[in-house]
């Protein structure tokens, strides 16, 4: 009798892990006036069906010793509700039957997913604790259209891919399953059988909200209800975030942080700080230093620490290196309470080819391009996202939305935009595929980036989310509105300014006169985009040397040059970004597995540089002339741009009410007495900043705090003053 309850072909297909529709045979099925229940439970010794009150409804006989059970159960004619009582060799389990539940995801939502709606990604995919018909469990859903079979595996089924094969929802390619009796905290992955029959390595969930801490690679069921119920206290901050044009008129001074190494815990095997520990230490530090924002290098889970986070595999999950995901929410909430914005680096260009990740996810090129001329990045040996695929584009946009919604981040810095925009980026002839018009522009990436920015600046995201592009070429309109043909970013990193100015400062002062244009060229295009001036981690690694180590001369000259450069940068048009350790002139390069050399602050010279950065930040934020027109030519005027023999530069910054700050920089170690400088207003001018002040580690040369502009024309101005320019120093002057 039992043999007739379970078809042999179904048994063989289930045991081989290749059944096309496990719900067609497993679970309860009506045959005439009987209810037949079939179960696949490899390793079970005895299986019975019980009513919810514990009464026995029937025994499921073993029809195959590999773990197939079947039997009829008593019923009252209605929909059967039963529990499975399972005797394992070393345990007893009573659970609902995963195959007694109907379809989970709404057809309309799946259609929206197939149409590329990021909201459907957030609504449908991943692991979500839910209650169905008074039964608690977890709904799993994953996109794998080319897979022959997908199973969810975890501690709850001994990682056995035969135990929980999923239901395919055609035509979306989404597989779903409700596993009763489990909840938040469960570890899981997916086991996929490719179309050609290969069983792939277990895959982490692309839409997981939480993960194990590396080097372990499982996804973790997040407590979604707890995240939704998180008690945010930042309503005032969120409502006050600058909108549209206002965000370009406010000060932005960004402290870039590698959270894994900012302050390790040496007493505990040099582990990384948790989010709560970072909140205790980093937020007061950033606040005290006068920075307006902290920007984290990528924090979406990444397997290899040496990638610094730029090869993520869980685009929705804060790295478990820093504790539970709620810890990041607490960090952001506390940062906002302190008046500090939080930006995160976000990586949509590429992903690593780790076996448990996105590469060949369902046995096909699902997230990446199939053609290696498009799908592999030659510099990083990583896979390139196929953003021209509707579902992949939606997946990435949903990730950005999730960071903005779930964690209240104030903005994202999009990594490696240049590599996305050009099909021949870092490729030789014959190694790339032209676009449909025969050109090198990646039209799919352009469309994706425009969509990303329109989404984050639209009603789908909290108001005030900012997007920043790391884009190193002259692609036009990176920060122009998408309606005008631009990409729609709020800001773009000014890589050209950074490279030119650092190259100038690397020269011996006696030779700088021959490279004078490197310091002035940035103003030729300074207002063609809205720029951030980045002194980032990329400039202090891979043998490039730290900022202070790039400067020539002895230690005093190097520190003085760096101070002068900071004075130049903070007065220059553009928002500011400085990488951790640079604010106190660390001598060594960035090392991801080592903490910055905080002990240098025992030395007065390094404390002085740190104090200077603090004071620059405070003055920059307090003086509208230095930030209100950062993105407008009306906010800048050269006073001296051609004194190459003396390596002196001077310029005026102003706001739209007429407030003025004049910066004058001397990039030689020669003090210059009686240096006449044209000024745009007469009378008393005070020294707002002198990077040679003794409190900053300088020699205290200068003008005793003030100069007088007399009616002596100079540099196109009707008034001028005679200045003493300290060596390797920058002065800021403002009308008294």
Curated annotation (Swiss-Prot):
Pathway: Glycan biosynthesis; glycogen biosynthesis
Molecular function, one GO term: 1,4-alpha-glucan branching enzyme activity
Keywords of the record: Carbohydrate metabolism, Glycogen biosynthesis, Glycogen metabolism, Glycosyltransferase, Transferase
EC number annotated for this UniProt entry: 2.4.1.18
Catalytic activity: Transfers a segment of a (1->4)-alpha-D-glucan chain to a primary hydroxy group in a similar glucan chain
Active site residues according to the UniProt entry: 415 (nucleophile), 470 (proton donor)
Cellular-component GO terms for this entry: cytosol
GO biological process, one term: glycogen biosynthetic process
Keyword check for Iron: no
CDD domains: AmyAc_Glg_BE, E_set_GBE_prok_N
InterPro entries noted in UniProt: A-amylase/branching_C, Branching_enzy, GlgB, GlgB_N, GlgB_N_E_set_prok, Glyco_hydro_13_cat_dom, Glyco_hydro_13_N, Glyco_hydro_b
Function, as annotated: Catalyzes the formation of the alpha-1,6-glucosidic linkages in glycogen by scission of a 1,4-alpha-linked oligosaccharide from growing alpha-1,4-glucan chains and the subsequent attachment of the oligosaccharide to the alpha-1,6 position.
HAMAP family found in the cross-reference section: GlgB (MF_00685)
Subunit structure: Monomer.
Protein family per UniProt: Belongs to the glycosyl hydrolase 13 family. GlgB subfamily.
Protein name, entry field: 1,4-alpha-glucan branching enzyme GlgB
Protein species of origin: Burkholderia orbicola (strain AU 1054)
Lineage: Bacteria, Pseudomonadati, Pseudomonadota, Betaproteobacteria, Burkholderiales
């Amino acid at each position: 009798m039992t043999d007739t309850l379970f078809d042999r072909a179904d048994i063989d297909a289930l045991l081989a892990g290749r059944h096309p529709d496990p719900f067609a045979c497993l679970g309860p099925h009506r045959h005439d006036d009987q209810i037949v229940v079939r179960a696949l439970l490899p390793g079970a010794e005895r299986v019975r069906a019980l009513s919810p009150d514990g009464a026995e409804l029937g025994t499921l006989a073993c029809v195959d010793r590999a773990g197939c059970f079947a039997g009829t159960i008593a019923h009252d004619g209605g929909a059967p509700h039963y529990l499975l009582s399972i005797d394992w060799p070393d345990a007893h389990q009573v659970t609902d039957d995963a195959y007694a539940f109907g379809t989970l995801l709404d057809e309309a939502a799946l259609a929206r997913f197939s149409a590329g709606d990021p909201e459907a990604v957030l609504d449908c995919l991943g692991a979500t604790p839910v209650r169905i018909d008074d039964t608690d469990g977890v709904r799993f859903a994953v996109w794998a259209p080319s897979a022959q079979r997908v199973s969810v595996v975890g501690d709850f089924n001994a990682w056995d891919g035969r135990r929980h094969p999923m239901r395919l929802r055609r035509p979306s390619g989404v597989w779903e399953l409700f596993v009763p009796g489990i909840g938040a905290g469960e570890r899981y992955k997916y086991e996929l059988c490719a179309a050609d029959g290969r069983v792939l390595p277990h895959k982490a969930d692309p839409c997981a909200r939480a993960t194990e801490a590396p080097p372990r690679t499982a996804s973790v069921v997040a407590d979604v209800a707890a995240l939704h119920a998180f008690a945010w206290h930042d309503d005032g901050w969120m409502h006050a975030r600058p909108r549209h044009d206002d965000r370009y008129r406010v000060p932005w001074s960004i402290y870039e942080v590698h959270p894994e190494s900012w302050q390790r815990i040496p007493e505990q095997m040099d582990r990384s700080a948790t989010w709560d520990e970072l909140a205790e230490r980093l937020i007061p530090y950033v606040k005290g230093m006068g920075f307006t924002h902290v920007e984290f290098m990528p924090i979406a889970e990444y397997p290899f620490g040496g990638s610094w986070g730029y090869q993520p595999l869980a685009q929705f999950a804060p790295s478990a290196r820093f504790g539970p995901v709620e810890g990041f929410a607490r960090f952001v909430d506390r940062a906002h309470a302190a008046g500090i914005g939080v930006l995160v680096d976000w990586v949509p260009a590429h992903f690593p080819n780790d076996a448990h990740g996105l590469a060949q996810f369902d046995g096909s090129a699902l997230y990446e391009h199939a053609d290696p001329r498009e799908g592999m990045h030659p510099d990083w040996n990583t896979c390139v996202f196929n953003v021209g695929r509707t579902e992949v584009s939606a997946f990435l946009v949903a990730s950005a939305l999730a960071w903005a919604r779930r964690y209240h981040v104030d903005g994202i810095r999009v990594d490696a935009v240049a590599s996305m925009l050009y099909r021949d980026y870092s490729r030789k002839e014959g190694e790339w595929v032209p676009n449909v018009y025969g050109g090198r522009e990646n039209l799919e990436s352009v469309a994706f980036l425009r969509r990303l920015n329109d989404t984050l600046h639209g009603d789908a995201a909290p108001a005030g989310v900012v997007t920043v592009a790391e884009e190193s070429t002259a692609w036009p309109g990176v920060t122009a509105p998408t309606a005008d043909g631009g990409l729609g970013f709020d800001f773009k990193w000014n890589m050209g300014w950074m490279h030119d100015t650092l190259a100038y400062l690397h020269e011996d002062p006696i030779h700088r006169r021959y490279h004078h244009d490197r310091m002035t060229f940035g103003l030729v295009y300074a207002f063609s985009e809205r720029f951030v001036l980045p002194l980032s981690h990329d400039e202090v690694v891979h043998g490039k040397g730290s900022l202070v180590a790039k400067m020539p001369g002895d230690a005093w000259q190097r520190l003085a040059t760096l101070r002068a450069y900071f004075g130049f940068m903070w007065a220059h048009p553009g928002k500011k970004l400085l990488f951790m350790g640079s604010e106190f002139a660390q001598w060594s390069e960035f090392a991801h597995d080592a903490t910055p050399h905080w002990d240098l602050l025992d030395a007065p010279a390094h404390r002085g540089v740190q104090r200077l950065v603090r004071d620059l930040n405070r003055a920059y934020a307090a003086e509208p002339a230095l930030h209100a027109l950062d993105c407008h030519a009306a906010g800048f005027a050269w006073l001296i741009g051609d004194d190459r023999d003396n390596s002196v530069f001077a310029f005026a910054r102003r706001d739209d009410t007429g407030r003025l700050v004049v910066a004058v920089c001397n990039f030689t170690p020669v003090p210059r007495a009686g240096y006449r400088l044209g000024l745009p207003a007469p009378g008393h001018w005070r020294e707002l900043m002198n990077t040679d002040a003794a409190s900053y580690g300088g020699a205290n040369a200068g003008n005793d705090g003030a100069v007088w502009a007399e009616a002596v024309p100079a540099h196109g101005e009707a008034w001028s003053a005679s200045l003493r320019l300290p060596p390797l120093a920058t002065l800021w002057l403002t009308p008294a």
